[in-house]
């Protein structure tokens, strides 16, 4: 069903599925450590985000018809540079990742149209990071901390800190929705020392 709907959306015929989208196996049938994008990968990424956008749009319209004063909110992780892997574009439609050179590996020219922040009254962003400030990232020396959530990678970039994650969340939502920082309490089991500073930073850096 996904293949058929994607072909209708993109106006293409996927001759080799799923290899033309992505593949986990090499030519000899051996499992790769990381998946490899196929020739239609970027269009597939756009289509997946469109499915979620259209669902949010329909749900928003239906709920507001029942109660115009209803507050509609959403949660996602704050790691936007890799969150496209989950098929979700929680940014403002006016934020265009295609204009960011390092995002052009996955973003199409129309990807920004899948953003749905404008349809939210409140947005909670998951700041599930061991590092709290951007300065912590600079001092990390190869230690990435706990990263067990879907879509995360092991890069030492500012978005993988409470401060940096909040910063990018506010940047890409363009002020169209209040951004509330969310902290994962269980992440601090065994050592609650960073918990207070993490909460303080989240309160400072978000709305």
Protein language model annotation of sequence segments:
Residues 69-71, 176-180:
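Proline-centered loop/turn at the N-terminus of a beta-strand
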């Amino acid at each position: 069903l996904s293949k058929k709907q994607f072909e209708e959306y993109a106006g293409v015929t996927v001759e080799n599925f799923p290899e033309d989208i992505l593949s986990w196996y090499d030519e000899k049938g051996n499992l790769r450590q990381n998946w490899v994008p196929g020739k239609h990968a970027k269009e597939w990424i756009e289509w997946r985000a469109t499915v979620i956008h259209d669902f949010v749009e329909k749900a928003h319209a239906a709920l507001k018809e029942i109660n115009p004063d209803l507050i509609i909110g959403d949660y996602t992780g704050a790691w936007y540079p890799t969150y496209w892997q989950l098929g979700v574009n929680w940014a403002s439609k006016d934020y265009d990742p295609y204009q960011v050179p390092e995002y052009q590996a996955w973003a199409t020219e129309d990807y920004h149209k899948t953003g749905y922040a404008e349809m939210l009254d409140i947005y909670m962003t998951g700041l599930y990071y061991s590092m709290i400030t951007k300065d912590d990232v600079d001092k990390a020396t190869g230690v990435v901390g706990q990263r067990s959530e879907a879509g995360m990678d092991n890069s030492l970039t500012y978005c993988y800190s409470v401060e940096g994650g909040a910063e990018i969340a506010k940047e890409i939502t363009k002020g169209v929705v209040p951004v509330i920082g969310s902290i994962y309490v269980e992440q601090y089991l065994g050592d609650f020392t960073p918990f207070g500073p993490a909460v303080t930073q989240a309160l400072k850096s978000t709305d």
